[in-house]
């Protein structure tokens, strides 16, 4: 018991390294920015990073600094603070089709059968790869700004519900919900 609560850096830093190693990070976008000051322009860099554990947790972060590696580090730290959990069907795709939006950017995400792969444009592909989705079809409409596309994708994923969550919200059994889904032409009864 006392060994578990020991103070000191080695064990704690090793645990932190293990926790950090479980995440996969993708650099989505790097941008050179300028701040106009009295003596001229002061240049810096802004980075957009997406991280995930490829098991249903994903987050994105934005970081700014004078040097690229520092901006990426800040963005990665921000992404770790911004992690969200997404319920996946069979651990490989979405439960249902969904749309998301942010600003002028709209994204449409569709569940896909096994073997389809990730059919999505740049920033959305990074989100799906770090999330652990293997089969999805995605379309972006409107703004192609990477920030808007990533935020719109997260907006869509935020509204994704598993059958278990829907059944709990409606106070019905999951099997009842699944039978309605499989039936297709079966009449849906409002509750």
UniProtKB/Swiss-Prot annotation:
GO terms for biological process: translation. InterPro entries: Ribosomal_Su5_D2-typ_SF, Ribosomal_uS5, Ribosomal_uS5_bac-type, Ribosomal_uS5_C, Ribosomal_uS5_N, Ribosomal_uS5_N_CS, Ribsml_uS5_D2-typ_fold_subgr. Keywords: Ribonucleoprotein, Ribosomal protein, RNA-binding, rRNA-binding. It comes from the Bacteria. GO terms for cellular component: small ribosomal subunit. Belongs to the universal ribosomal protein uS5 family. Part of the 30S ribosomal subunit. Contacts proteins S4 and S8. With S4 and S12 plays an important role in translational accuracy. NCBIfam families: rpsE_bact. This is Small ribosomal subunit protein uS5.
């Amino acid at each position: 018991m006392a060994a578990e609560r020991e103070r000191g850096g080695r064990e704690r830093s090793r645990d932190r390294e293990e926790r950090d190693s479980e995440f996969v990070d993708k650099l989505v976008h790097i941008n050179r920015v300028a701040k106009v000051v009295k003596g001229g322009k002061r240049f810096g860099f802004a980075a957009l990073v997406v991280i995930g554990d490829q098991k249903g947790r994903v987050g994105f972060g934005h970081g700014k600094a004078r040097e690229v590696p520092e901006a990426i580090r800040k963005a990665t730290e921000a992404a770790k603070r911004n992690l969200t959990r997404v319920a996946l069907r069979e651990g490989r795709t979405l439960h249902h089709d969904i749309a998301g939006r942010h600003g002028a950017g709209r994204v449409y995400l569709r569940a896909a059968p096994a073997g389809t792969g990730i059919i999505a444009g740049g920033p959305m592909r990074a989100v799906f790869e770090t999330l652990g989705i293997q089969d999805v079809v995605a379309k972006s409409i409107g703004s192609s700004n990477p920030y808007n596309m990533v935020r719109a994708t997260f907006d869509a994923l935020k509204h994704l519900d598993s059958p278990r969550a829907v059944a709990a919200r409606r106070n019905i059994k999951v099997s009842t919900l699944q039978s309605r889904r499989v039936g297709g032409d079966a009449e849906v009864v409002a509750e």
